[in-house]
């Protein structure tokens, strides 16, 4: 997990996560803090193991850690967070020791994690990220559930596969 720790220690990652924590400090809805990012990473890794997929653990964690990092940029300038996150990943991942191929895979996953799960098998990492991101939310115990703009059918009623 040397490369994952390099992401966590990267100055740009730390700066954007601190900014996001500040911007979301009063947010009533789901936050995009380190706890969320690690929840997504762990759910992704469980999915990879259960399905017997051959995806490097560092790549899984990189996608999870970076997938919402662009939210601060979205809140400040309106740039979609998946686009801002992809740009941040382009800067952080090479510094953390990820290859060009790994970086491209993580960027593709970040770019597609907001829409519907991709059907293309080449986008497996994006599909896993999409599912884990949605599954990570504890809607059933959220105090702001009634005010949330997610449709009821998208809100998690409990822990599910």
Where are these regions (language model features)?
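Metal-dependent phosphohydrolase cores
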Residues: 1-161
């Amino acid at each position: 997990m040397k490369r994952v720790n390099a992401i966590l220690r990267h100055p740009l990652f730390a700066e954007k996560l601190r900014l996001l924590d500040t911007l979301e400090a009063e947010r009533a809805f789901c936050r995009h803090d380190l706890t969320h990012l690690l929840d997504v990473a762990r759910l992704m890794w469980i999915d990879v193991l259960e399905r017997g997929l051959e995806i490097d653990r560092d790549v899984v964690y990189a996608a999870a850690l970076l997938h919402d990092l662009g939210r601060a940029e979205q809140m400040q300038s309106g740039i979609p967070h998946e686009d801002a996150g992809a740009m941040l990943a382009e800067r952080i991942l090479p510094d953390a020791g990820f290859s060009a191929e790994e970086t491209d895979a993580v960027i593709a996953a970040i770019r597609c994690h907001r829409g519907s799960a991709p059907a293309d098998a080449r986008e497996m990492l994006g599909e896993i990220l999409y599912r884990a991101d949605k599954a990570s939310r504890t809607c059933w115990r959220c105090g702001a559930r009634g005010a949330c703009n997610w449709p009821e059918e998208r809100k998690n009623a409990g822990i599910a596969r």
